[in-house]
Amino acid sequence: YRHPMEEEDEFGMEVFGDDAPRRSKAKRKKRGPEDSPFSVASLTPIQMPNLDLEAMIDERQYFSRDEWLNMLLRSAGYEPSELSEKERLHFIERMVPLIERNYNLCELGPRGTGKSHIYKEVSPYAILLSGGQTTTANLFGRMNSMRADRVGLVGHWDCVTFDEVAGMRFKDTNAVQIMKDYMASGSYARGRDQINADASMVFEGNINDTVQNVLKTTHLFDPFPPEFNNDSAFFDRIHYYLPGWEIPKMRSSLLTGHYGLITDCLSEFCKEMRRKDFTHHIDRYFRFNSDFNKRDEIAVRKTFSGLAKLLFPDEAMDKDDVRWLLDYAIEGRRRVKEQL
């Protein structure tokens, strides 16, 4: 039995029936499909075949800012009523690498705060590298290769996440330099080839001491391996440092029982919105002063753009909304600068 959905490569729930009356009692040398005692009685789709992005954006006007934010959090499985406004923004920030191209996010903090949940369970376009281990060839492709592996993971995924930065080890001595090139420009050289990709990079890890003690003895990037810790230029390419110690540890009350978007819809929404750029909304009301160098401005703009695409996809933002997101974006970039 072939259902029309099989041609669309979709997922569904099938109910099988026993077609005993259809069985042929005659002995056959070769059995055909008609001899099967089973048939598909019904099929219920459980995955969206496509997303009407404009229709979804149009629905934004019927929600207040907080209602839309809460809907996004519930769609990711979280219960916003258990979170403060700052905590809710932290959880939304975790989604920015999924909706903003070439975005570099670092989140370090205590264990058990659900750092990898978004990238493992919510989006099929993100890959989680367990233990933070990979190779240069796996991440950036093989030199002078004409095969599909020429571009590596950054060319095949929207987001590449290292779930334990302490385990990041590369045998290739040029790996850190290649990663810096990619994080800065979205391109890198492999042999004779110059390759472009738009995957975002997420670096996650654990801080096993209090932040106060860490700052007294070292810095907030300490969990990274020595080959990274000795290179401040690498950290300067990180757009936002998400303070994991400000996020509550996961507990049953943080898991929502309310309705939200199905994950297919949320992930497709993020993927489609990656093509858009909302950075120009900053310039309607604000200008960067001389305290911001070029990398600072790029980092803040990209964080702002990602948050704005998530929370204001219809671009209906007033000055207070822009300032709200801009303040949050600057805070995360300042945390990076203070460690350099």
PLM segments and residue spans:
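Short secondary-structure capping micro-motifs at structural edges
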Residues: 93-95, 189, 224-229, 252-255, ...
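Conserved ASCE/P-loop NTPase catalytic core
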Residues: 79-213, 218-222, 236
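Amphipathic alpha-helical transducer elements in NTP-driven molecular machines
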Residues: 172-176, 196-198, 228-235, 259-263, ...
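Short amphipathic C-terminal alpha-helix that caps PH/PH-like domains
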Residues: 72, 95, 179, 266, ...
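A short helix-turn-beta junction within AAA+ P-loop NTPase domains corresponding to the substrate/partner-engaging
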Residues: 215-249
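Extended, charged/polar low-complexity intrinsically disordered regions
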Residues: 1-75
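Short acidic (Asp/Glu) and glycine-rich catalytic loops that position anionic groups and cofactors
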Residues: 47-51, 157-162, 208-209, 214-217, ...
